[in-house]
Amino acid sequence: LHTALRSKNNDSTIISEEVKNTLSKMKTISDEINNGARVGHSGKKIENVVNIGIGGSHLGPEMVTEALSFYAQSIKPYFISNIDPDYTENILKSLNPDTTIFIIVSKTFTTIETLENAKKVRKWFVKNVNEESIKNHFIAVSNNTEDPKEFGIESKNILSIPEWVGGRFSLWGSVGLIISICI
């Protein structure tokens, strides 16, 4: 079924409707960030996007953004996949929270490494900005829609990963949001 993510077939099956809706939401978010319609809490244009995930939620998107960096937009991509606190801290030191979007990518939204990193980033963000502004700066990609809301992410900023999408194929769908934003 993962081939449905790459298909240009416009039949009206349930799967293709789900794929079309997800791709449409990705395009909207990407376009809004790149054209300045979606801004940070302070009204400043987004300059950085950070993908927080491991395995298929990280490797494919990082590979594609690196491979196609020649075609990059003005938004700079970062990837947090390592649980080492120094690794995450070094990335955060180089970012302005006012101009950064964070994408938490976890199919179940229970992946320990991803959630630990997301909690570190959230704590840093709240310390430097405030909790209310999470809604402007955090996006979740998951098939679990409830836990991201508890994290503070608004429904409109939650993109689904269908259960039938395996990790290595996930970059063709919502896991590839950072690709859509940056390339």
Locate predicted features.
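Extended, charge-enriched "interface" segments that sit outside catalytic cores
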Residues: 1-42
